[in-house]
Design a protein with these regions (language model features):
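Long, hydrophobic, well-ordered secondary-structure blocks that form the structural core
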Residues: 85-142
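Short Gly/Pro-enriched turn/cap motifs at secondary-structure boundaries
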Residues: 141-145, 152
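N-terminal pre-ligand scaffold of iron-sulfur
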Residues: 1-101, 149, 153
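A generic structural signal for well-ordered coil/turn residues at beta-strand boundaries
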Residues: 112, 147-149
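Single conserved hydrophobic/aromatic residue that forms the stacking wall/gate
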Residues: 155-158, 162-164
Length: 164
């Protein structure tokens, strides 16, 4: 990750803290530069608990919805034990976004791209045609290493929070 001094002229930031009559807003790079956004994400959100919703928004077993945390796609899901789970909304096969909108999941979380399927615990359970036409298994591929990536999560006073 780049340092702030590699992204913008630090003198531009000093002007922000000046007396109100001489101060300026943040430089344009702070709003348009991806490297700056990455630094900001790290400083503000890394290793901190962040509220991402309330459990009542997914009250029933199988209720699921996508959530975008500053460009990081997540899935919030109510599992079969009524526990809330949070995963990265990215299929381990081709990186495709699994959920596009709020939905009700019956048995598996299925990627719309190649139908790779995950159970409510994030475990990869189906890999259609991975070994060729109508061959759904491959001895050289381990499903156990390709599940959905879980996000640290807790329920705090009716709020769903993650530590990313």
């Amino acid at each position: 990750m780049k340092k702030l001094s590699q992204i913008l002229n630090l003198n531009k930031l000093k002007v922000v803290k000046k007396n109100i009559h001489k101060a300026h807003g943040l430089p344009n790079e702070c709003y348009t530069n991806d490297d700056y956004l990455n630094i900001e994400r790290k400083k503000i959100f890394e290793n901190k608990w962040i509220v991402i919703g309330v459990g009542s928004s997914i009250p029933n077993i199988g209720d699921a919805k996508p959530f975008d945390l500053l460009g990081i796609p997540l899935i919030i899901l109510r599992d079969k034990n009524k526990k809330v789970r949070v995963y990265h909304n990215v299929c381990s096969h081709r990186g495709y976004k699994i959920l596009q909108e709020k939905c009700k999941i019956k048995n598996v979380i299925r990627c719309p791209y190649h139908s790779w399927s995950y159970d409510f615990n994030g475990k990869l359970v189906a890999t259609p045609h991975i070994g060729g036409m109508n061959k759904h298994n491959c001895s050289k591929f381990s499903k156990s290493e390709s599940g959905l990536k879980a996000v640290s999560y807790t329920h705090l006073r009716a709020h769903e929070t993650i530590n990313h």
